[in-house]
Amino acid sequence: MVVLPSTALVEDRTVIDLTDRASQLRQHVPGRATVSVVVPTLNEVDNIVLVLPRIPWWVDEIVLVDGGSTDGTVAAALAVRPDLRVIIDETPGKGAALRAGWHHARGDIVVTIDADGSTDPAEIPAFIGPLLAGADMVKGSRFVHGAGSADIDLLRRAGNKALTRLVRMLYGGRFTDLCYGYNAFWRRVVPVFEAAGDGFEIETLMNVRALRHDLRVVEVASFEAERIHGQSNLRTFSDGWRVLRTILRERFRRPPEVELAPAMVRLTPATAERGWS
């Protein structure tokens, strides 16, 4: 794994100085939770330059985890956002990339989005709000009121629905969308997700682990757009089978003992009435 300095591929000192000043303005605010956004990439040069500018300016840190792109993704990303933290981790799979990002993130809150444009960074505030109100984790759902998807087909929708019902039956909870990668959580709960899967099943495993450890989880409406350019690496049947195996294997696995750091916020009576899972 290689960590590149944020200015490694950028020569414009004016741009660097401006981003440094913006970073300084975001820091040292008493009581303010800091936010890191983790973005895994692999040959997303045409998409990443469109996604990064949409990330809210007040986000404290963007961690780009690249799996060994050969199309110039990292250079293009740094040209758009010189303040990026770049992690090079060629371990195959989205899950491996996300874990690397979590371990390098320095914010109190970690948000995960996709680099292909399917998850809208403009929704980040909707994920942050419930965390500040007392939730441990916030997950996006494409199937609640106000949500939707321009990308999921009937087969994937049916598979997701069946797997979600299975998780409800085995683990409880009231999740409506099991296989969606837009999530946010306090960094202190990362130990719950340790040793998660390397592939797309990581999103399911995060949800299951959250239930098994009695985390306070909130679903928020999210709209999934079509990827802007290129083809998805998702394989409906093989990845669906991996998700099913993950659900069943985790059911008979003893949950690891995890000692979580104290929460920065407490659940108040007003927020408790909103239906935490």
Where do the language-model regions lie?
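Cell-envelope/extracellular polymer assembly enzymes that use nucleotide-activated donors
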Residues: 34-36, 61, 205
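Donor nucleotide-sugar binding loop of glycosyltransferases
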Residues: 44-47, 69, 94, 120
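Acidic helix N-cap motif at the loop->helix transition within catalytic regions
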Residues: 46-50, 71-80
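A conserved acidic beta->alpha catalytic loop
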Residues: 66-75, 117
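Conserved donor nucleotide-binding strand/loop of the catalytic core
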Residues: 60-63, 74-104
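Acceptor/aglycone-binding surface of glycosyltransferases and processive sugar-polymer synthases
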Residues: 89-104, 112, 122-200, 227-246
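Short, well-formed alpha-helical segments that are part of the catalytic scaffolds
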Residues: 18-26, 42-57
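Hydrophobic helical membrane-anchoring modules
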Residues: 1-31, 170-172, 195-277
